[in-house]
Amino acid sequence: MLFPSIVAALAALANPVLSLTIPQATGSELDVQLSAIGNTRIKAVITNKADRQLKLLKYNNFFDDGPIQKAGVFKDGQPVKFEGMLRRVLMKNLEPSLFVSLSPGQTVEREFDIASTADLASGGAYSVFSQGAIPFAEGDGTTIAGAVAFKSNKLDLDIDGALAATVSKAINPISARTRVESACRGEQRETLLKALEYSAQLSRAAAQAAQNNTRKVEEYFMKSDAQTVETIVARLNAVAQESSSTDSGATRYFCNDRGNQCTPNTIAYTLPSLNVVVNCPIYYDLPVISDECHAQDQATTCLHEFTHNPGVYDPYCRDHAYGYDGIRKLSPEQALLNADTYSLFANGKPKSQTTSNFNLKF
């Protein structure tokens, strides 16, 4: 993992939703129907099927105004490479403006263009599908009370590749002429180094726990067979390795926002297509490591973000769900590729704040 001295100006981005096979849609309190309204432009019709109001968090789903991936795109049964942003959201002290309320039976529509975050220039047959769990609050409050799962229909498309290639991309290529001096200095640098130290420690401990406690693996990942455990251990060990070096590795880490994506309650974000991690200002307000079960802190944020980077471990993790209640609604396939599942598993019980001496070089 590198602290670069130069970085390109980062433009608008996006956020993965799905991977692997496409399951059939089933009943849910939230109905999502996808339809095509252009070559690569999609309309999502979201209906509250519950008998109560749903007060949904806007981030990382169809209601997000940011350039995140609203649906997975597939060609020949395989996910198309995603080029966009994944953000980690602080799940407390949420502003009312970060929620959208749907009354029972209410329907809203959202539109997005899948070509802005995927290369569809080859054209031909594609499938689009979305699935996940959206956090919600209750009444007039903004405290997350749970998560509502959803599965959309599978939308088949015949895409004109030449037309798709004309859609503006959400992320611009790196320009060697656009340089920003390193901002990882002083107190921010020391804070991040300490968080990386704990990230390495937590990741290694979690990898060992996965091998020794299949009951806990089942609780968080919905499955505990040998292949599942092997994947979990390999990913966590890869995160530990990436956390243990600041002058080499697969990722670049920025202490300050360079893409103007640090919206309210965004702790950090990752650009998986570039293997870049960026901290937002509120990252530095969090404790380096927390003794509270499932709490968000700097160390688990580093762990969380590194699981998003294909250079660390591929296939990289998405943001299918947030929080313990949310991850418990995922399928085993989704859980294995969900970033918050790993960070929650790693701090699923209070941690000692003793620090081992990692050889962190800068």
UniProtKB/Swiss-Prot annotation:
Similarity field: Belongs to the peptidase M35 family.
Biological source species: Coccidioides posadasii (strain C735) (Valley fever fungus)
Chain positions recorded as Zn(2+) binding sites: 304, 308, 319
Domain of life: Eukaryota
Signal peptide: 1-19
CC cofactor: Zn(2+)
Gene assigned in the entry: MEP2
Gene3D superfamilies in the cross-refs: 2.60.40.2970, Collagenase (Catalytic Domain)
Reaction it catalyzes: Preferential cleavage of bonds with hydrophobic residues in P1'. Also 3-Asn-|-Gln-4 and 8-Gly-|-Ser-9 bonds in insulin B chain
Protein name in the entry: Neutral protease 2 homolog MEP2
This enzyme's EC code(s): 3.4.24.39
Catalytic site positions: 305
Cofactor descriptive note: Binds 1 zinc ion per subunit.
